């Protein structure tokens, strides 16, 4: 929709971005924790296509107001990170957590794509989430794409076997 409304001929040097989130905070009776999706689509050059960063979060605070503040901080950090650290995906992920802790929020899935992220392996980004203590578990599908652990494991029987995976991307 935005691409059809923007007139590139009138604004050849402008870079555009969109930010979106779909989140639910904790309910009144505190039986359902907050969670949702956040993302940013942005250009680093007016003549390039757009890049996209999308991630899923679980909100850990026990107060809706605190969760809303956490969402605002994450959104601001995401936009800042997209424009300042797009060439360093690890730093971009770390910048999303500026002024936040795992006690506030857990990022359990992330996906980056676009012309500036062509060399980025999203599976490695998920492993960064584990390494940086932003989540406890990540899951890759058979196609190598990241999946949200809570969706994949919901109401499933699980067998865990200790092993090693070297290299993790093959």
Walk through the language-model features, giving the residues of each.
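Non-catalytic terminal extensions that flank enzyme cores
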Residues: 1-167
């Amino acid at each position: 929709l935005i691409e059809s409304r923007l007139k590139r001929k009138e604004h050849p040097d402008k870079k555009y971005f969109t930010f979106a989130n779909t989140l639910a905070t904790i309910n009144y009776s505190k039986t359902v924790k907050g969670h949702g999706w956040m993302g940013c689509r942005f250009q680093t050059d007016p003549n390039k296509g757009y890049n996209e960063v999308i991630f899923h979060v679980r909100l850990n605070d026990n107060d809706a107001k605190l969760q809303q503040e956490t969402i605002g901080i994450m959104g601001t950090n995401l936009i800042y990170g997209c424009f300042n650290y797009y060439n360093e995906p690890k730093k971009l992920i770390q910048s999303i957590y500026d002024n936040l802790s795992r006690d506030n929020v857990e990022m359990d899935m992330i996906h980056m794509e676009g012309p500036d992220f062509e060399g980025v392996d999203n599976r490695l980004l998920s492993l960064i989430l584990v390494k940086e203590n932003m989540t406890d578990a990540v899951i890759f599908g058979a196609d190598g794409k990241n999946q949200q652990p809570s969706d994949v494991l919901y109401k499933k029987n699980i067998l865990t076997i200790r092993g090693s995976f070297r290299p993790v991307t093959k």
